[in-house]
Amino acid sequence: MTYISLQDPELGRLMKSRSRLGSRAPGYAAIVFGLPFIETHHTDTMATDGTSIYFNRTFVQRSTDDELLAVLFHEGLHVQLGHHLRRGNIDPTLWNVAADYAINLIVQQARLSLPDGALLDEQYRGLTAEQIVRLLKQKQPDQPDQPEQPQPPQ
């Protein structure tokens, strides 16, 4: 974990985006305002464990302000939907992909600008992460579920 200065330009952009979220989606902003930002190299983008929002400095630097707004909304949705609590024994990578498919369609519907490469597929509209996991498992070779254990931020 890296502690960052309030003078940090990337932290400033995240805080500004979080404030903008307050006017666009106040309920989600309330969730996001309660989560501290922590810099990490364990993810290439941003992530949440339900208690913090982890960010990769390079991702923040290359993202537009509108993309940061969308990603913060995305992370707030993860928390609101309890994705950090519902994974159970599902492989963490598979779970994150399924949860992202479910959430990104909501972000898109809110007319926010997701970064290039965001996981979007209309076939998953209206489905839960659990339902998407089942569909994704049908498309891939059998893989055993992972035992439930704490995972580092992604």
Question: Would you name each region that the model predicts?
Answer:
Residues 1-70, 76-154:
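Short, functionally important secondary-structure microenvironments
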